[in-house]
Structures are given as C-alpha cells and as structure tokens.
Amino acid sequence: MSHGQPPPGSSMYGFGAMGMGSGMGSGMGSGMGTGMGTGMGTGMSASQMTSDPQDMMSLLDTSVFPGFDGMSMSLDVGDSMSNPFTPVSVPPPLPAGNAGPSHVGVCGGHGAPDQLFSPDDLIATSMSSAGPMIATPTTTTSGPSGGPSSGGGSTLTEFTKRRNWPAKVVEELQDWEHILDANGRIKHVSPSVEPLTGYKPPEIIDLFLRDLIHPDDVGVFTAELNEAIATGSQLRLFYRFRKKDGNWTIFETVGHAHIAAAKFAPNPQNQSPFCQAVFMMARPYPTKNAGLLDSFLEHKIENERLKRRIAELRREEQEEQEESHRTWRMSQEGRSDVTPSDDTATQMGMTPFYIPMNAQADVMMPPPSQPASSLNIALTRENLEGIAGSRPDSIREKMLRYEGNHADTIEMLTGLKYQEGERSHGITTGNASPTLIKGDAGIAIPLDRDPRTGEKKKKIKVAEEYVCTDCGTLDSPEWRKGPSGPKTLCNACGLRWAKKEKKKNANNNNNGGGIGGHNDIHTPMGDHMG
C-alpha cells in the first residue's frame, strides 16, 4: 500500500451531504481516516448531536454546511476511483437516561473522566499514515440503575486511575504525616500540620524534629529513632511537642524507617543498605473519645475503691457488734451466778467485783419484806450499761474510738454527713447502743417513736395539691371550677371567670331574644363551682 496523491475523481469539485459527527476531537471525517479518530460521521442530525452535553460540535448548526458527494478522500492510491467511498457511520451516543455524562477521549471514545487509554487506542492514534481507520468509541456500560456495571470497575478502581491520587489522599488526612531523613531533619509534612501545631509547612521544613520536642522527651525520641533505623522495626512513642503559640501538646507517633538498597546511596563507595527516610504519622493524644474513655475509667476505679472501703467499714462494724453481743451474753451468764447481795450492792452503785467485805456481810441475806422480784431491777439497761462502763476498755469506749474514725473516713470519701444520722444520736447521748435512747426497764425506744403508741392512729387525710391554670398559684383557700374542669382555678380566678361566663351568657340571651330566636335557660356558673 503506497501513500501518495490520489488521482482526480469523477466529481473532483463536487460536494455531497456531510453531517457533523459526535466527536470533535476524533477527526474530521470517516473518509479521512488518517489516525484522527472515528471522524465526523455522516447522516447525523442536529438533534443527535445535541444529545451529548460534552460534545462541543453540538453547538454548530449543520444547515450552514453544504453537503459533500461520495468522493473518496482516502490517501490510499489502491482505491478505485470508479467506486466511490462509502462513509462509515459512527454509532450515535448513548441517551442521557441510559448512561451518565461522558467525556470525549483522544480516541473518540466516551469514557469516564481521567480515564486511561489502552495501548491499542494509543497505537491507533499514532498511526497517521495507515490509511482509513475507524476507531471504535469506548463507552462505559451502565447497569439497570444507571451506574457502572460490574465490568466497568468499582469506584475505588476509578479513583486510583486518576492522576496524583496518592497526594489527594495525603491531603485529606487529619493526622500529621511527616518524613524525616536519617539525621531527624524534617523533609516533608502534610497540610494537616497547620491546624495541629500552628506551623505552616514552609516554616517547619528543614528543622530538626528534636528541637521542637520537650527536653525531657528528646532522649526517648532519639533512642527510638536510632533503634528503628538500625533494626528496621516500627517505632511508637509519645512526646510533647511545642506548638507555634508556645504551648505544649502530646502526640502519639508511629513510624518506620525506609531502608534502601546500596545502589541508591549518594556515595558510590557505599556497599550496604542505608536509611533513606523515616516515615512518621502523629496524632494528638488523647483524642476526644480517648479522653472520655479515660475519664470514665477513672470514675469507675474510684467507684470500685469506694465500694471496697464501705464494705470494709461495714465488716468492721459487724465484727464490733458481734463482739459487743458476745460480751453482753457473757455478762448475762455472769449475772446468773451473782448472789442477791451482789444485786443489792449493784443497786447501791457498787459493782459486784469491788464490793467491800463489810457491805457484803451486811447484805448477804435480803430482808423478808423485800420481794423476790426486786432482783430483776439489776437487769435494767441502765445497770447493764453501768457494769459495762466500769470495766476498763469497754465496748462503749471502743465504739466511741473507732466510730469517729469511720465517720470521718466516710465523710471524706463520699461527702455524706454521716455523723448527722441515727448513729450520731446514739453516740452523743452516751449510750452503748447507738440506735437506742434511755427508756424504762430495758425497753428500747427509738428516737422517731410516736409517744402515743397506745392510741389507735387515725387515718390522716392527705391534702390534695392543686394548681391554678390561670395564674399558676398553689395556695388558695378554695378551688373553683374553670374551663378545664372542677378545681382548676383558684378562688380569685374562678370568681373572675364565672362572672365573665355569666355576662357572656346574658349577652347571648339578649341577642337571641332580640332576633326572635331561641332563648336558652343558662344556669349561672357560680352554682356549679366547687
């Protein structure tokens, strides 16, 4: 196949019908197939051209162009001049409803934006002298919902086909991404460094990162960085960073060293792998969610500690109560062996352990006139307390000594006024039993006991609480009927509302009687008020 000037045809200066095709960047015609794309197809109407919103040629009116005849415009001399060339029509673009907006590509295809072309399309474009060539437009098929089908690739695939997509990902990161050299000098930072630290990227480039770290954390940072470079392991540390305004913020940093081969070393004499850069990613610590979690854990730990402390105090209190009951039982058993003279001596204010010999001889036998029931007087609570109080280090003293400490501890831990409770009354009255007060014959009388226990309690009528729907008052000598029902208005508002309703009813009666209509008998609202 030779390429030269074609011989003159039968209608050399004639022009046939020519329509504007769907691809401006695709070429100038299907007959001029010199690698310029699919061409401007024949027979395309203006309505078909305007169906593609991305087609720039759709703005032109085809009526101003005269038609071309069927002359062969191919550069191939092998074509017969007697047989006119039949143009190949380009398929019309997809309707707007079946496919999304398309873009005219280099090869005349309607593909996705920033779509890469296959090698076949590039070869077809470069072959400008290969004779007439019709490039097939590449279109992205769509599924029933109008989106790309499974064969067209996912959204992630389309995104990764775009130019500089890794840089776009880095720009959207909220964490601070920075690259250091082997000496710890900052070589690159992400745009997120400004909202986190206040520094703009040009201000922090070529600075040593250790110069911006708190002096107490520089040693840890240097050690971790050197270890990551030497071993190739991942580093993770926390350090305090000085922001532009002078304040300190804590960063949680992770990173790793990039170990390059020896052939990439700037020194040709280097024959071993070397650290080319250190990639690091930092974020503020703690974050908002981490701060909330830490606060919750702190409160949880404090709550558990208080629960354990309260359980210990209750256990100690229970042990002391058991000890007091045990001592009381032992005293009761000892009282059963006491002679009547001991009881009489106890009545006189002397304990049975310290009765003088002369007093014991005088009261050894009670007089016949004394009833035997008088021995029960020694079993009163006052006498028992006197016996317990006369002993050294009695239970009462132990309770006074320990309970004060417990109350102070509980008040300190819980903030509760523990000493204003029931136990404080028992301690201040000097009784061994904190829940009791002085009574008669050992009968315990609680503090909140009703003195009229023998009388039958009458049922107390609980006063109902009402609120006025008009003025909102809660105190009224009498509650009256209102528009919302009985006892919804106070005395003043109820009288005012009743007068208003009475006047309104009177006016309605007068108006109805003047027209000659119907007179209703209305009962005054005051008669229905409670």
From Swiss-Prot:
Asked if the keyword Metal-binding belongs to this entry, the reply reads yes
* Region spans: Disordered: 134-158, 315-343, 504-530
Per UniProt, the ranges with Gly residues bias are: 144-154
Record's Gene Ontology CC terms? nucleus
Residue spans annotated as Zn fingers (GATA-type) read 468-493
What is its induction behaviour?
By blue light.
Q: What is its main location?
A: nucleus
Q: List the residue ranges of the region (7 X 4 AA repeats of G-[SAT]-G-M).
A: 9-44
Domain PAS, which positions?
A: 162-232
- Oligomer and partners: Heterodimer of wc-1 and wc-2 (Potential). Binds to DNA.
Outline what the protein does.
May function as a transcription factor involved in light regulation. Binds and affects blue light regulation of the al-3 gene. Wc-1 and wc-2 interact via homologous PAS domains, bind to promoters of light regulated genes such as frq, and activate transcription. May bind directly to frq.
Q: What is this protein called?
A: White collar 2 protein
Organism (species): Neurospora crassa (strain ATCC 24698 / 74-OR23-1A / CBS 708.71 / DSM 1257 / FGSC 987)
Q: What is the lineage of its organism?
A: Eukaryota, Fungi, Dikarya, Ascomycota, Pezizomycotina
